[in-house]
């Protein structure tokens, strides 16, 4: 199936300016200047932790040097296994030109709130688990199980090194309906609300009972309840049009883990 390459490229190149600052209670001596980075929306905080840790470590007491690093925004600990773009859309929904200010911590890791991903290997394991889950939903796992280890490595390294062509040379196989089918079996989907930083998953087919391709409006109807109605969806900082087809969304707007991560706005009925 022909993909809208310019859309894929636009999503891939989306970045967020982040201003990292140290926890003032952990600083020894002179307060360091903030550390600024432009980071891909598709990346994860553990992939930039080494760079940020290296900058601030000289200002942190020796007892905290080897601590498990974590980050917060305005006191809210950031989930290390969420893509950075998802975190930004949940916590900083109003787009502006100022950097997103995050605080890095070297101690007091909130184990009751965060999954500890203190190595790239652990993050890679989590990422591959998500990919396999997504493929089970789309193709009953038939595509990713037919891939070789080198293909899995190419996906991961393409993400880590931000290499569009390297990543999509393999990922395109995961983004096509299986065999002679015209759509995925189900849409890998994670749904977030502004008042809750956890996600829910719902089994959603891209095709209606009558055989028609479902749109975002159909999805919002399925997500609505008698007491509250879904009125809008956003991903990658984009407010989505209700007529957008779910199959197209999954093929073009999914994160590298192959899931659509949607921030959903609700209104009480």
From Swiss-Prot:
Domain of life (superkingdom): Eukaryota
Membrane topology per record: Peripheral membrane protein
Location within or outside the cell: Cytoplasm; Preautophagosomal structure membrane
Residues forming coiled coils: none
Post-translational modification as stated in the protein's UniProt record: Conjugated to Atg12, which is essential for autophagy.
Position(s), cross-link Glycyl lysine isopeptide (Lys-Gly) (interchain with G-Cter in ATG12): 132
Keyword Signal: no
Cystine pairs: none
Keywords (A to Z) from UniProt: Autophagy, Cytoplasm, Isopeptide bond, Membrane, Protein transport, Transport, Ubl conjugation
Signal peptide: none
Any single biological process term in GO: cellular response to starvation
Chief place of localization: cytoplasm
UniProt cross-references to Pfam families, sorted A to Z: ATG5_HBR, ATG5_UblA, ATG5_UblB
GO CC, alphabetical: Atg12-Atg5-Atg16 complex; autophagosome; cytoplasm; phagophore; phagophore assembly site membrane
UniProt key word Transport: yes
Entry function: Involved in autophagic vesicle formation. Conjugation with Atg12, through a ubiquitin-like conjugating system involving Atg7 as an E1-like activating enzyme and Atg10 as an E2-like conjugating enzyme, is essential for its function. The Atg12-Atg5 conjugate acts as an E3-like enzyme which is required for lipidation of Atg8 and its association to the vesicle membranes.
Protein family membership: Belongs to the ATG5 family.
Protein name: Autophagy protein 5
Gene: Atg5
